[in-house]
Amino acid sequence: MSFLNIFTFFSVLVSVATAVRFDLTNVTCNNLHGPHCGTYVMEVVGQNGTFLGQSTFAGADVLTESAGDAWARYLGQETRFLPKLTTIASNDTKNFSPLIFTTNIYTCNPQSIGDAMVPFANTVTGEIEYNSWADTADNASFITGLANQLFNSTQYGVQVASCYPNFASVILSTPTVNIFAANETLPDYCTAIQLKAVCPPDAGFA
């Protein structure tokens, strides 16, 4: 059995076992501009220098193809070439880049300046995802006002947590970011977190 098949099997198995319930609703746009500006990064409260971002890794298919084919896929900006895991880490973590957001005053949706990916919640795992191709999946739920709910999670019926719920997060030694109902007991592999808006220059970003 190939590594990819084993990975898929464990991912499906654990995803079914860790299904969570949450009720995300649209909220009024409020206080989304951060302390000083409309462009911001999300810092984990109480963990200085730890931000919400993406960790990239090379998939099994990339490692088995020729250098020429891999280079062509990279130049073509194929979204599946380097899968991204939404996680929290410090800015100097290898293969990690913080997500930089800007406020949309009309819809309250955060958008990454670098890749313009739209966030959504996976209704099976509860994981917050930004993968540009995965929004077509049956279990994708677009969330209007997601940033506001992350900043004020207890007010809007959700908890935000960093989790090690599946095979991928264990292998990559980096947690996923998940959302749960406010009254739900978190699994023992999850830790509740809070996020705050920080202006990029204040966080050490140019």
UniProtKB/Swiss-Prot annotation:
One GO cellular component, as annotated: cytosol
InterPro entries: Vel1-like
UniProt-annotated glycosylation sites, renumbered to this chain: N26, N48, N91, N139, N152, N183
Top-level taxonomic group: Eukaryota
Modification after translation (UniProt): N-glycosylated.
Compartment annotation: Cytoplasm, Cytosol
Entry protein name: VEL1-related protein YOR387C
Origin species: Saccharomyces cerevisiae (strain ATCC 204508 / S288c)
